Amino acid sequence: MSQNSLRLVEDKSVDKSKALEAALSQIERSFGKGSIMKLGSNENVIEIETISTGSLGLDIALGVGGLPKGRIIEIYGPESSGKTTLALQTIAESQKKGGICAFVDAEHALDPVYARKLGVDLQNLLISQPDTGEQALEITDTLVRSGAVDVLVVDSVAALTPRAEIEGEMGDSLPGLQARLMSQALRKLTASISKSNTMVIFINQIRMKIGVMFGSPETTTGGNALKFYASVRLDIRRIGSVKEREEVIGNQTRVKVVKNKMAPPFKQVEFDIMYGEGVSKTGELVDLGVKAGIVEKSGAWFSYNSQRLGQGRENAKTFLRDNPDLAREIELALRQNAGLIADRFLQNGGPDADDGDAAADM
């Protein structure tokens, strides 16, 4: 047998294309059609299907027009930074297209009134409030394998408490239990997520590493597995308040695309999240319009095509809210200049010390 195989390798007259064809047909007989293919010549390859985040600026910063389907997404940040709001807005955008969405509420903290204000159709939203981390991830796996769900949100990784920890005593030390649970679950989930074309969004919290002298002491919960399996990682931060006279009516928010397997990462975008409303679309039109040179700013005045929008940003936002046709026209112009705006985002947010964990695993 060893002599025959040696002759086969050394025989220069063997037609490699026929040998490859035979090998490919054998693989397809064993594992099914489509189990191996040529990347460039396959006619069934389709464009990346995406779902909007509800923020025009973030959709542009992501490079593909939104969050990609059939992928794992991680949204992380400090408390009250807008993580759940961003996930709920993505659900609302998916439902507008007729998508079926699910919300695994491990924190038992979903506010249905707020979700409705963001545009979520509660009648058609599947919700689960599991008791343990194993139960949450089993429900996630079952829904993904069904192939019927478009967007599934797990809120949050930190709340996925292993059964052994819940059943144990309060002071028991169980190191690495949650990290092992996440690692095992993601190994199972990743193939079925791709086949079912389901987007799975994991919301995560931030913890501080003790004794860090250099670099950022921040890290996310649940071990390192999610950092590797996620195709997109978004770092969301509250950077200020939106005020109307003395009353705080929203948060100024910054989102950094820390990891992106679909397009160049490290783009950074800022927008307002208004209380009871979500992402301020008119605020984005003003800010992105100025950045792209579509909206002119002269002193405190904003204008578009020689038409004045208002004095001051809030007045310009109000004018666009009252004139939806003009707002749509500016949005269309912004989408046509998406490449230019994306380049500006890249200039604003290169990799820094805070991205140490993320940049290493791309």
From Swiss-Prot:
Organism: Rhizobium etli (strain CIAT 652)
GO molecular function: ATP binding; ATP hydrolysis activity; ATP-dependent DNA damage sensor activity; damaged DNA binding; single-stranded DNA binding
Alphabetized InterPro entries for the sequence: AAA+_ATPase (IPR003593), DNA_recomb/repair_RecA (IPR013765), DNA_recomb/repair_RecA_CS (IPR020584), P-loop_NTPase (IPR027417), RecA-like_C (IPR049261), RecA-like_N (IPR049428), RecA_ATP-bd (IPR020588), RecA_C_sf (IPR023400)
Record-stated family: Belongs to the RecA family.
Keyword Metal-binding recorded: no
Main subcellular location: cytoplasm
Protein's job: Can catalyze the hydrolysis of ATP in the presence of single-stranded DNA, the ATP-dependent uptake of single-stranded DNA by duplex DNA, and the ATP-dependent hybridization of homologous single-stranded DNAs. It interacts with LexA causing its activation and leading to its autocatalytic cleavage.
One Pfam family matching this protein: RecA
GO biological process: DNA recombination; DNA repair; SOS response
Keywords recorded for this protein, A-Z: ATP-binding, Cytoplasm, DNA damage, DNA recombination, DNA repair, DNA-binding, Nucleotide-binding, SOS response
Protein name (database record): Protein RecA
Organism superkingdom: Bacteria
GO cellular component, one term: cytosol
Entries under SMART domains matching the protein: AAA (SM00382)
Binding positions (ATP): G77, P78, E79, S80, S81, G82, K83, T84
Subcellular location: Cytoplasm
